[in-house]
């Protein structure tokens, strides 16, 4: 085990997600040299590193879904260790939300990423929204090939709704820590996903609950 590599990875990860040298993105547009490429093929769950958070909102599903109309920058909550969203730029016609729609998202540290909707299904009692994120420009995300977000909203039938949000990452196999296989995925989980990223997920769900229950 190369302890020096592990220590360096965790140090750079923490420095990057804390916004060292960050620049506030005033507008959202494709950066110089940007190439809009198809998203990577999504692997099976056993190859991904995942984390799940859930929350109960004291409102029926129909009211919870109205919150989807909020701008992304007002939905994803910035934490002390992760940047927030500063803007969005559509890469396909129409609005973001239908399967196949794609956008560029700008973050408050000056970096960008791409998102595409993979799945959107709704019944009277449930809602599922699944999307892929890739083409990260943040230094902190260099080890990441792509991420997959998956929301499952369920009407509990008593005026409450359960939201379950799972976020999964595929690491680049040729870069550290992905090149260390299962142990590298473990390092990524305990050093980032179950800590700073989980904090962001909880803050976002809490913000949704507060907004919907007003």
Predicted regions and their residues:
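Glycine-rich portal/gate segments that line the openings of hydrophobic small-molecule binding cavities
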Residues: 76, 86-146, 199, 203-214
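Intrinsic-disorder/low-complexity, polar/charged segments enriched in Ser/Thr/Lys/Arg/Asp/Glu/Gln
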Residues: 48-56, 102, 112, 148, ...
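Hydrophobic pocket/interface hotspot
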Residues: 60-71, 75, 103, 117, ...
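N-terminal secretory signal peptides that target proteins for export/translocation
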Residues: 1-6
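Beta-strand/loop substructures that line and gate deep hydrophobic ligand-binding cavities in soluble
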Residues: 133-195
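Hydrophobic ligand-binding cavity/cleft-lining segments
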Residues: 25-95
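A short, structured loop/turn motif at beta-sheet edges
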Residues: 58-62, 118-127, 152-162, 210-214
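Bacterial N-terminal signal peptides
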Residues: 8-19
């Amino acid at each position: 085990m190369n302890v020096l590599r592990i220590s360096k990875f965790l140090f750079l990860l923490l420095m990057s997600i804390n916004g060292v040298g960050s620049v506030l993105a005033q507008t959202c547009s494709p950066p110089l040299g940007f190439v809009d490429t198809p998203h990577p093929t999504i692997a099976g769950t056993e190859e991904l590193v995942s984390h799940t958070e859930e929350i109960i909102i004291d409102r029926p599903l129909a009211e919870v879904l109205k919150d989807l109309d909020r701008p992304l920058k007002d939905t994803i909550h910035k934490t002390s260790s992760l940047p927030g969203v500063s803007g969005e730029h559509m890469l396909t016609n129409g609005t973001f939300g239908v399967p196949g729609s794609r956008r560029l998202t700008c973050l408050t540290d000056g970096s960008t990423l791409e998102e595409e909707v993979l799945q959107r299904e709704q019944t009277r009692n449930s809602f599922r929204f699944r999307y892929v994120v890739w083409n990260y420009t943040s230094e902190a995300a260099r080890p990441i090939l792509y991420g997959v977000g998956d929301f499952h909203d369920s009407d509990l039938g008593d005026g409450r709704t359960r939201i379950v949000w799972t976020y999964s990452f595929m690491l680049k196999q040729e870069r550290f820590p992905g090149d260390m296989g299962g142990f590298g995925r473990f390092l990524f989980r305990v050093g980032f996903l179950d800590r700073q990223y989980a904090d962001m997920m909880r803050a976002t769900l809490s913000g949704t609950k507060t907004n919907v229950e007003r």
